């Protein structure tokens, strides 16, 4: 999906060398025309390796989006981890969500999703994320397994006052 609302379009060709979603929060998600889009109101990180960043520092963009080209939304695996205590022992349960459920929860304002780390193989990207909500549990780790896809980053401006 081409987006003419943004000045810059960057493919994720360098696996985090130039652009990264680490610690970036999405408060809205959409899926249309086989594009899974995460809206990032506080932008994402641009490293000094990027041609547009002459600051020699890792800085944020302003509001931006990142798109993943996905053939079938049903192919995305969402694993949500919940920690709890039972009989004095700490346990972690794993719940499988479909992507539609995550989209609904984020878009309803019940939670946001924070990207923590990316792992990329020849057949998928796995994102380690955090689901943050205003009600208990306030924080749950999750994994997004997105099949063989590339990310495209859309943004307008660097915010040189927002350094890593």
Where are these predicted regions, by residue range?
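Surface-exposed, interaction-prone regions used to assemble/regulate multi-protein complexes
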Residues: 1-164
């Amino acid at each position: 999906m081409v987006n003419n609302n943004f000045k810059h379009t960057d493919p994720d060709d360098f696996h985090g060398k130039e652009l990264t979603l680490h610690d970036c929060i999405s408060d809205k998600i959409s899926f249309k025309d086989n594009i899974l889009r995460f809206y990032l109101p506080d932008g994402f990180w641009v490293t000094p390796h990027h041609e547009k960043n002459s600051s020699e520092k890792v800085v944020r963009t302003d509001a931006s989006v990142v798109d993943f080209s996905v053939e079938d939304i049903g192919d995305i695996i969402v694993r949500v981890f919940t920690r709890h205590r039972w009989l004095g022992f700490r346990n972690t349960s794993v719940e499988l969500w479909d992507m539609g459920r995550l989209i609904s929860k984020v878009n309803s304002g019940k939670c946001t999703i924070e990207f923590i780390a990316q792992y990329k193989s020849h057949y998928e990207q796995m994102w380690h994320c955090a689901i943050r909500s205003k009600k208990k549990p306030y924080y749950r780790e999750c994994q997004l397994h997105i099949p063989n896809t590339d990310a495209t980053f859309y943004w307008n401006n660097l915010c040189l006052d927002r350094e890593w």
